[in-house]
Regions:
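Anionic ligand-binding catalytic core segments
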Residues: 2-111
Length: 111
């Protein structure tokens, strides 16, 4: 659960709706296993304010400042995925690739 704080110090729940597409979780129809993960990442579209995740982040930062921070590392991702034994190596590898790429892309958000 994430929250946002406004200028008056009041908190509201962060509008995070669906992280499924962000992790290419529909492996049957939209994001089949075996296809290039980076190519598939380019096809993902947000479904809220804008279809572009970066545009949504830019708007949020413009309105509220840079309040989104990551408190995890690639090592944390790797350790968590090592424990996710219920998923195939292919699925875990895909999630690892996606999260590592996003950590690199949004390095300025890391705490």
């Amino acid at each position: 659960i994430a929250v946002l704080m406004n200028g008056a110090g009041m908190f509201k729940y962060c509008p995070i709706f669906d992280n499924g597409d962000g992790l290419l979780s529909d492996t049957i129809l939209d994001y089949p296993l075996g296809e290039d993960t980076f190519d598939l990442m380019e096809t993902v579209r947000a479904k809220t304010v804008s279809t572009d995740f970066d545009e949504q982040l830019d708007v949020s930062e413009h309105l509220y400042g840079c309040n989104l921070k990551f408190f995890f590392t690639k090592r944390d991702v790797d350790q968590l995925l090592e424990q996710a034994k219920g998923y195939s190596d292919e699925v875990r590898g895909r999630v690892q690739t996606i999260l590592h790429r996003q950590i690199d892309k949004y390095a300025y958000l890391k705490m």
